[in-house]
Amino acid sequence: MGRWFDAASALLGLCLTQHDEATAAMRLESAAEGKTPRELRKLWEILPDGSLSLLPLMAMLADTPHDPDAVSQASADFHEAVARALSDWILQLTGPDEADLPLCLAGGCFLNRRMTVRLISLLGRAGIHPLLSSAVPPGDGGVALGQAWLAALARREGALDGGDRVSP
């Protein structure tokens, strides 16, 4: 997801060269401050392979004039569209028997308060109450820690096939 934030920031002229991790995403979130997102058409697609595409959203951003008010509005619209896209994707991939299972939100994009708060609100309306990391940051380090924990649990439960794959 993070690269979508980087691309959006570049398309809006907020950060063309990133020297530090998350600079582009932070500028995008800052640009949206104080703006209410517009009601827009669906600007994402869930592809036949189950992946999420934000290309329609990127096309809209590419057409945004680079004046400060338009960039600020487009930034707010981006955050809203991403939250709605993720919610739609999660709800489509979650079957009725899985709605009560824990859903963990992990990755650096969940440091973005605007998008994360909106996503949690949308999922809550659907009866899904996701888990967010509080003991460790949700970025790459936290994701790696979670992966290591799951691998240790799978090994302990005998779900590893002796190699590096989890047995069904």
Name the predicted role of every residue range.
Residues L131-P168:
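Glycine-rich phosphate-binding/hydrolytic loop that grips phosphoryl groups
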Residues S75, H79, G108, S134:
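Glycine- and other small-residue-rich loops at beta-strand/loop junctions that grip anionic moieties
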Residues R3-L101, R114-G124:
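A contiguous, well-structured pocket-lining segment that forms one wall/lid of small-molecule binding clefts
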Residues A81, A85, F110-R113, G139, ...:
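C-terminal region/appendage detector
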Residues L86, L105-G108, L119, L145:
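Hydrophobic, well-ordered secondary-structure elements that form the walls
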Residues M1, L103-F110:
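Glycine-rich beta-strand-to-loop/alpha-helix junction loops that act as flexible
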Residues W4-D6, G13, F110-L111, A135-P137, ...:
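Short, glycine-/Ser/Thr-/acidic-enriched flexible segments
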Residues P102-L103, R113, L119-V143:
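Conserved phosphate-binding/catalytic loops in two-lobed NTP-binding clefts
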